[in-house]
Amino acid sequence: MKENFNISKLKNGLTILTYNMPYVHSVAINLIAKVGARYENEEEEGISHFLEHMAFKGTKTRTAQQIAEEFDSIGGYFNAYTGYENTVYYVRVLSENCHKALNILADIIQNSIFADEEISKEYQIIMQEIAHHHDNPDDLIYETFYNTVYKDQPLGKSILGTAKTLVKFTQEHFLNFIGKHYNAENLYLSIAGNIEHNKIVIIAEELFASLKQGVTSSFIPAKYIGGKGFIHKELEQTSLVLGFECTSYINLEKLYQTYLLSIIFGGGVSSRLFQSIREKLGLAYVVGSYNSAYFDSGVFTIYASTAHEKLELLYSEIKNEIIKITETVSTEELMRAKIQLRSNLQMAQEQNSYKSEEIGKNYSVFGKYILPEEIIEIITNIKADDIINTANKIFSGTTALAIIGPNDLNGF
């Protein structure tokens, strides 16, 4: 409900967003920095993610252990994650501990010291994360896919960075990156739960007073390229990711048409890919489709794994299903997909962790809060012809293909 949503801007420009949910006992806090991996230059690759790791490693007044103990002492859950377009720090605590949680979070964002010994330790941890990532075929194939689709662009680089760049980062690098991107205009504090907006504003005015004004960060526009990427790896199965360019998240009508297409095509056990590739032909245990959207680009992906000798047949059957969905979509299929999408959206509204992230990301991207009712209306108005037209536009575009397996795939 719109009346539960409030927004204020502090004197320094920090945006405060709250959504009151009086029936819950907790609050979910998100501090969203509008900076991620695609904002990095070549020398900075991986610094957004590294910085997120360093956020809980000590401030001017708290050691890493004290930060952990203070969060535990208020029964809080805290973590952070880095994407291509933002970095999110989130906390969930009982409403009575909201002030204390904000105090710690504000200290982390404004006063982290990035001690050399902590940088060295975290470097080793991230290198282990990268090694784990490269040992996982699913992670590796998607990394290869994005390297191919957005070749030589920040959106095609790994969020984790590389040993070549990570090993060079010092306290100075982190402080410079913070100074450049972690300013009041580039941060959004969003809170959902049993809270009062005016009290949150007063608390935030006090705790985030030292944030400098600054400007919103910018990035180089993405250019979808397509192409093929192959990785030779001794595995029990061969996996493929087939992709096409699709809409960004700025056009909501096109975005939700693409979501519905993905659900119908490969989004669940009743989807066409699942029923054809797995249930009817037995070609794959895992098969599905998904669309990823960014500010100025998007990718529709189809993923499957199969026995090495069945790869060509699998690929052929996927292409057959692509042809079919560009021709017909039934009323029943569309209705099932709409119910799935609406159900997921409406059930998520009951979770304050979802609401906190939703209002923060909405405002950081669109400059406004998009009501769930607006989204539901968009979904409701989509017709079968819209899905067919979307499928034709997407699948007539330049193909991108990534394959990982033990065989020689260069002739594929």
From Swiss-Prot:
The keyword Phosphoprotein does not apply. It comes from the Bacteria. GO terms for molecular function: metal ion binding; metalloendopeptidase activity. The active site is at 52 (proton acceptor). Keywords: Hydrolase, Metal-binding, Metalloprotease, Protease, Zinc. Its cofactor is Zn(2+). Its EC number is 3.4.24.-. This is Uncharacterized zinc protease RT0210.
